[in-house]
Structure formats: structure tokens, C-alpha cells
Amino acid sequence: MPKMKSHRGACKRFKATASGRIKRERMNGSHNLEHKNRKRTRRLHQSALLECTKKERQIKRMILA
């Protein structure tokens, strides 16, 4: 049986931290920023951790396959 390949789209969007949590980038922070206020754009450039453990397990399986 061939090796399992990791999901390339998931690998580009998510990173696993040292503690095993999944880190993601926030959406809506790359363009059309002129009508968003400064506080919002600052917040959009910060990365976030996934909250739902079910989704976390699915993404870990895709990344580490």
C-alpha cells in the first residue's frame, strides 16, 4: 500500500504548535483594508488557535498523514 499523502491545502493554511494545538491565520486581512479600521486590521494580522476539538482532529489527520 502506498504512503498516505498530507493534504497540501491544509498544510499551507494550518500549522501545528509544539503543544499539539492547530494555529491558523484570520480571514479578511489581505486586501481591501482601506475601509476597515486600524484596530480591526491589527487584530486580523494576528494568528489564532482552533477552538473546536473535532475540527482540530480532522486537520491534524490531514497535515500529519
Swiss-Prot record:
Q: Which GO terms describe its molecular function?
A: structural constituent of ribosome
The record's Gene Ontology cellular component field reads: cytosolic large ribosomal subunit
Alphabetized UniProt keyword annotations:
Ribonucleoprotein, Ribosomal protein
**Which domain of life does the UniProt lineage start with?**
Bacteria
User: Which terms does the UniProt entry file under GO BP?
Assistant: translation
- Keyword Transcription regulation listed: no
Which family does the UniProt entry place this protein in?
A: Belongs to the bacterial ribosomal protein bL35 family.
For this protein, the record's HAMAP family field holds:
Ribosomal_bL35
Name of the protein described by the UniProt record: Large ribosomal subunit protein bL35
> Which organism is this protein's natural source?
Chlorobium phaeovibrioides (strain DSM 265 / 1930) (Prosthecochloris vibrioformis (strain DSM 265))
